[in-house]
A protein has these predicted regions:
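Compositionally biased amphipathic helical and low-complexity segments enriched in hydrophobic
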Residues: 7, 18-19, 135, 197
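N-terminal Lys/Arg-rich, disordered targeting/topogenic segments
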Residues: 1-14
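Membrane interfacial helix-start segments of signal peptides and signal-anchor transmembrane helices
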Residues: 12-26
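Solvent-exposed beta-strand motifs enriched in subsets of small alpha/beta binding domains
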Residues: 21-23, 31-136
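C-terminal amphipathic alpha-helix
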Residues: 171-206
C-alpha cells in the first residue's frame, strides 16, 4: 500500500508540475504577445494607422449649394481654398494642428468661422506620409506658385497617388489638373488643393 501511495503521489506531483509548466508557457506566450503589441504601438513599429486627422477652417454654412459656391468663389478670389463640402460648408484652409486652425478662426473675427475635423482613412504609414507631403507642397504652392520645386513635388505626388489605398478617381484627377495649372502658371490660386482644401496660406495666416 505504501508503494502505491508513493507512486500515486509521484504521478500527482508530475501532473501538477506539467500543468504548472503549461500554464507558465501560456502566460509567457500571451505576455510576450501583449508586450510586443504595446511596444509596437508605443514606439511606432506597427505600420498601421486607423485615421489621419486634419483641422479645416470653415468660414460659412449655407442652405443651398449655389449660395455656398458663390461664397466659395469670393474666398478663392482672395486666395482661400473656397472648397464646398457635400453639406454646403465652405472651407478656407486646413492644418495638421488643431491649435493652428483655432488661431486662424480667432484672428479673423469678421467671419463666423469654426474648426471642422476631417478624418481620412490612411491604413499605412506611407499613406500618411504622402498626405502630409501633399499638404506641405500645396501650402508652398500658394506662397510661391511658380516654384520649380513645387512643380516637381506635385509631379511626384501624382505618380505616387496609386500607392494610396483610399484614393478616389476624383482625387487623382484633381491632382493632375492642379499640376497642369501650376505648369501653365495660372494666376488663379483657387485651384489650390481642392480635395483636401489646403490653401489660403496668405489669405488666412496664423
Amino acid at each position: 500500500m505504501d508503494n502505491i501511495k508513493i507512486s500515486n503521489q509521484k504521478k500527482s506531483k508530475r501532473t501538477s508540475l506539467l500543468i504548472f509548466i503549461l500554464f507558465l508557457a501560456l502566460v509567457i506566450s500571451l505576455g510576450g504577445l501583449l508586450g510586443w503589441t504595446l511596444y509596437s504601438l508605443g514606439f511606432g513599429i506597427s505600420p498601421r494607422h486607423k485615421m489621419v486627422t486634419y483641422y479645416a477652417v470653415c468660414l460659412g454654412e449655407f442652405d443651398t449649394k449655389a449660395q455656398a459656391e458663390s461664397f466659395g468663389q469670393g474666398l478663392r478670389l482672395k486666395g482661400g481654398a473656397g472648397f464646398v463640402t457635400d453639406d454646403n460648408k465652405v472651407l478656407a484652409s486646413v492644418y495638421t494642428s488643431k491649435s493652428q486652425a483655432e488661431n486662424v478662426v480667432s484672428n479673423n473675427p469678421d467671419y463666423a468661422g469654426k474648426v471642422v475635423t476631417i478624418e481620412i482613412n490612411a491604413e499605412y504609414k506611407n499613406e500618411r506620409k504622402i498626405l502630409n507631403n501633399l499638404i506641405d507642397v500645396c501650402i508652398d504652392y500658394v506662397k510661391n506658385p511658380d516654384s520649380a520645386d513645387c512643380i516637381k513635388s506635385l509631379d511626384d505626388i501624382v505618380k505616387r497617388a496609386d500607392e494610396l489605398d483610399f484614393v478616389r478617381a476624383g482625387f487623382k484627377s484633381y491632382l493632375t489638373r492642379m499640376v497642369s495649372v501650376v505648369k501653365n502658371m495660372n494666376s488663379n490660386l483657387g485651384y489650390g488643393l481642392n480635395y483636401l482644401c489646403v490653401s489660403g496660406a496668405d489669405f488666412l495666416s496664423v
